[in-house]
Amino acid sequence: MRVLIKNGTVVNADGQAKQDLLIESGIVRQLGNNISPQLPYEEIDATGCYVFPGGVDVHTHFNIDVGIARSCDDFFTGTRAAACGGTTTIIDHMGFGPNGCRLRHQLEVYRGYAAHKAVIDYSFHGVIQHINHAILDEIPMMAEEGLSSFKLYLTYQYKLNDDEVLQALRRLHESGALTTVHPENDAAIASKRAEFIAAGLTAPRYHALSRPLECEAEAIARMINLAQIAGNAPLYIVHLSNGLGLDYLRLARANHQPVWVETCPQYLLLDERSYDTEDGMKFILSPPLRNVREQDKLWCGISDGAIDVVATDHCTFSMAQRLQISKGDFSRCPNGLPGVENRMQLLFSSGVMTGRITPERFVELTSAMPARLFGLWPQKGLLAPGSDGDVVIIDPRQSQQIQHRHLHDNADYSPWEGFTCQGAIVRTLSRGETIFCDGTFTGKAGRGRFLRRKPFVPPVL
């Protein structure tokens, strides 16, 4: 099958040009002017539009069981939503397995979840929920099989202590894998939460107050120092929500330490006032939403290059689940927001169309750097001969208001309801196949492929 995309502006992280793009058998074959492919072929007119590499979202949680509830998006509805939002690859953070389970256990479970459902290509981050000799021995074997990143938690049920973190950092570094971490100070959060609950203060606002930014920033600083102690091990901070943590990361980067960081649209565009609304429980996530000042600091990091990736942390629980389980108590509410369908459009509208970032920087944040960090480059995150024909076409002339009834996930609400975006996703192609076009999903379950990722190689700092 041949697909010729004509008259668009093709954008990569290192530049843009008005040119045609030819995809053949799912692979980009040629870029240039006046391409005349062999018949037959499909022609797509992208006049006035940007032609970007398909999005790479390296932080989703599909079909995750958090003990009190299972998220309502599985690998079909979640990847369907991703496709309709211009994302053609996801790397899912696997949930915790049974106490004492092997690393491989969750990989086998999650491959089963995704195999016949995923619409787009996918991989997984390993999850390390305890440390022993068997787990440490499994890491290099898992890395050789294409899992080149693993996640540690400093909070929640399976948090690791500093000694365990050091052991994990060392072994992951030796194995060619990147350590990712959810950084929050669990003890400080538990103390604050207990104070509020004892005082009967259980409204959504107290979720944010129980997890102040210092809890996150302290854990970021601690992880940076532990990574240095562990032999300058590479480190990736997930879902950054505040400027103090970013300051610590800037300092580490200035000292040439191999650290990278992602943030998410919710931390750029939503703020803590959401907790004071009638439906504030729908905004419970961790880290919580911060104030507008912290938003501004994150936007500075987006603009000046201090932040490397924009992902989503898509983790969907319905309002019915939230209200039934929490009964008005923030501490009992399952955490997470939907957003995998909105990431590309929100960042394009609030970043590119406002002049905060260039189209090239948009590519770097949404596809190129995620692909480079997580062993998918140049197959993903790039439009060049030999790369996968993963494409999102965005029309900057169109204005759209986000409405949940038009979205494709399995949630019963959107945190972005009513947001007006300048720029619309008009078509998504995965390996040359159109899977979304002009508001209609055209893909099918099970067409996504599991991606064996290459060992971690640090991009130039």
From Swiss-Prot:
The UniProt record lists the keyword Metal-binding: yes
Enzyme kind, highest EC tier: hydrolase
Annotated substrate binding sites: Y156, S286, N335
Residue sites binding a divalent metal cation 2 per the record: K151, H182, H239
One of the GO biological process terms: pyrimidine nucleobase catabolic process
Cellular compartments per GO CC: cytosol
Keywords: Hydrolase, Metal-binding
Entries under InterPro entries matching the protein: Amidohydro-rel, D_phenylhydantoinase, Hydantoinase/dihydroPyrase, Metal-dep_hydrolase_composite, Metal_Hydrolase, Metallo-dep_Hydrolases_sf
Swiss-Prot/TrEMBL cofactor(s): a divalent metal cation
CDD domains per UniProt: D-HYD
GO MF entries: hydrolase activity, acting on carbon-nitrogen (but not peptide) bonds, in cyclic amides; metal ion binding
Binding site for a divalent metal cation 1: H59, H61, K151, D313
Top-level division of the source organism's lineage: Bacteria
EC number, UniProt record: 3.5.2.-
Record PTM: Carboxylation allows a single lysine to coordinate two divalent metal cations.
Residues modified to N6-carboxylysine: K151
Annotated Pfam families: Amidohydro_1
Family: Belongs to the metallo-dependent hydrolases superfamily. Hydantoinase/dihydropyrimidinase family.
Quaternary structure annotation from Swiss-Prot or TrEMBL: Homotetramer.
Name of the protein in question: D-phenylhydantoinase
Highest classification ranks of the organism: Bacteria, Pseudomonadati, Pseudomonadota, Gammaproteobacteria, Enterobacterales
